[in-house]
Amino acid sequence: MNIIKKTTSLTLVAVIAMSGCADLDVSNSNAPDQSRALAKPEDVESLIKSTFLTWWQGTHTTGGSFNPGVMADANTSSWGNYGMRELASEPRAAANNSPAWNYAYALEQPWYSWYGAISAAKDGLSAIASGQEGGKSFLADAEADTRAKIFADFIMGISNGMVAIYYDKGFLITEETDFSKEITTVPYDELMAGAIAILDQVISDCSANAAVSLPEDWLQIANLTLGDLGKIAHSFVARFKAGVARTRQERGAADWASIKSHASQGAPMAPAGDGDYWWTRTQYYTGVSASWGRSDYKMLGPADKSTGYTNWLGDGSDATIAGRKAYSMETDDARITGPLDADGLQTQGLYAKNEYRTRLIASRGLYHQTYYLFNRTRDYAVDQGLVGPMKDINQSELDLLQAEAALRANDGATAATLINKTRVSNGALTAAAAGDGVGSVSDAANALDGGSLWAKYKYEKIIEGCLQHPYTGYTDRRGWGDLVKGTPTMLAIPGKELEILLMENYTFGGQDAIGTPGTAGKIRNNGHRSRGFNIEWERVTPLNKADLH
């Protein structure tokens, strides 16, 4: 596939010193002086509004956006693209963090995109602060200054938060960060705490300025106010507090009362695609191509009434895994199949379709193969021609987070009511009830009538979240302790960045020392560079089947 890239250069003019590492000269001699580049108010406002596109593409458009789904076994793929085959094959191997790896970019792009958004937001905030000296407004008026500042803070919050979701550590960069002083990496939990503190302030500021309008092209959503942005910030806080956990124990220790509160005050987020720079690779490719949108049986199988899924799972041994073969399920879930046709074949379901064929290469692992296409996003990718809503936060995500809070509080009645919003309305399945029993977080996902509420909840959370926000299925399974053994529970700082920082390379995953850093490629050069963020926005072009490899 050919990708046309629009480039803008953003620079953090600073010197960052890290503990145990060389000082880094981060000035960019090829970039314009910051004070001149951001001297005009309209340039600053344009820079700030562009930050969400940078965040969006880092989350939804980079090739790496496919990897969380296949590591979570919601989607399945043995194609090499973006490193999917290596990250999803069994037995799981450690993530390849060598900068020389063919697909290193898939692990690097989210990191650089999110820090690029942070960089631009911080530059914009600094320019506004400088322009306000003497008590004057820098942009058109005080309201414009307030809107731009709150929006930039929102971007810094959700960008720091995504780094904490995916990587083991990072730099906590805020409006107050002073680059003349030493800055060190912080672990993911500390990074997330900082991100949430920013978003909590955004929520407060949005409440105080709720009536201020937000231009449509800032978030690609029409008729939005800062009051609405505050609700979206609530959604992110709920998602982040639940999703940051690396283990079952950490997720259990989360503040579920707070998660419930934020989720109940949250709102969905679905920017409008424009068929140009505003697009989502995961929702496009899987909606238009049967070779990309394959459903893993670990996602759909819990709804199988036959013994097929149990037989497919087997005893979980390497030999059993290698012998797994695609099969047709028997299910009442309307999301997976519609009524049988005249020939007794399953028809298109709400989200999926039984193609009665596999499309993945058998020699790369029969266990990857599936008959089921998960083409839930065909409305965006085909019917609407990439110009419809691109869903990131659904109401179902917010409802189901509240359901998990209820389960953890042993409130089966409330949990059942929330689970049924999708189980019954979308799946046309028998309603869950308090009498099913709360069960335990260790219960395997199970959509069948005999399953516990925890089992039914897990099934709903995975199928409803699949191919919406790319990371939620991965963070859910990670926090429930349900990832396949050896799956990386997070990524290391990208190997390319480790070279720059003169830090030893490391990685996560594999069959030994699960969840602890392993070894990877070593430093290859002196690690110095200009620390300018070169943001490339990718323009969508038609998918070419020949791109699969």
Model-predicted regions and their roles:
Residues M1-S19:
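Sec-dependent bacterial lipoprotein signal peptides
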Residues I4, H60-F66, K461-G479:
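Bilobed periplasmic-binding protein-like "clamshell/Venus-flytrap" ligand-binding domains
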Residues C21-S78, G451, G481, K485-H549:
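Membrane-proximal, proline-rich intrinsically disordered regions
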Residues A211-D217, T430-A447, A513-I523:
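Surface-exposed intrinsically disordered loops and tails
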Residues A403:
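Active-site-proximal region of nucleotide-activated glycan assembly enzymes
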